[in-house]
A protein has these predicted regions:
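Mature, function-bearing regions of proteins
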Residues: 1-234
């Protein structure tokens, strides 16, 4: 799976797609009280060291933010400037997905899906290989795949810093679990890279593509050290 820049509308994840993904999860999970993964999973091992999830959240935010759909979708939103509340909300959601029981994980996923379903608009400028005026929606599958990618790659990398290198067998298991994790977003697993090596090639391709070009609006946003941010940083 290689990075591409699209000039046409991509597949949008709708509520029936999410329902179908949730049905797949319910069919696959044998111990719903243990959630999507369970205590014997590589995922549980990876998220156990305390620094891993917080550091993943920070890196994922930096990797996601330049994408035009995300940069302009958050323009004017409190989430683009009120960093600490957003960080706490994200951490709560991820721990629900990684460690809570299945019903809690699905409920949180549905809430996040509902929030993202409201985010859409037209690009105010040509950027990242997309045309000015092109309609965007936060729940487009190609964007969600990139968001998913920015979560699972830093998780592995930070775990290997704090917990030790994963064996090739564990990497394979981890990626299988990550493909299951994608169902929480309503992503069709057939659209994902087939294995970890293909995933890394996809990730590197997107990271090096025009999609990661930074808009002037994004570059000039206030940051937590700029003195221009309202809310809990002040």
């Amino acid at each position: 799976m290689t990075a591409t820049v699209h000039a046409t509308q991509e597949r949008v994840i709708a509520r029936p797609d999410l329902d179908q993904s949730f049905a797949q999860l319910r069919a696959e999970v044998t111990r719903p009280e243990h959630g999507v993964f369970g205590p014997d999973s590589v995922m549980w091992r990876i998220v156990t060291p305390i620094p891993v999830v917080p550091m993943m959240l920070m890196e994922a935010g930096l990797l996601e933010a330049p994408h035009p759909w995300i940069a302009f979708g958050t323009m004017g939103s409190k989430s683009s400037t009120e960093f600490l509340p957003r960080f706490h909300r994200s951490a709560d959601a991820f721990y629900d997905w990684f460690c809570a029981d299945l019903d809690t994980a699905l409920r949180t996923a549905r809430r996040v899906f509902g929030y993202h379903s409201q985010i859409q608009g037209e690009l105010p400028e040509a950027i990242g290989g997309y045309d000015a005026g092109q309609h965007y929606m936060a729940n487009q599958q190609d964007v969600l795949i990139w968001v998913w990618a920015t979560i699972i790659k830093p998780l592995k990398e930070y775990y290997e810093v704090f917990g030790g290198r994963l064996s090739s067998a564990d990497v394979d298991r981890y990626y299988d679990e990550c493909r299951r994790f994608a169902l929480l977003f309503g992503i069709d697993r057939a659209a994902l890279p087939a294995d970890w090596d293909a995933f890394v090639a996809y990730f590197d391709g997107v990271a090096a593509s025009p999609v990661m070009d930074l808009s002037e609006e994004f570059l000039n946003r206030p940051g937590p050290l700029s003195g221009d941010v309202s809310g809990p940083w002040r």
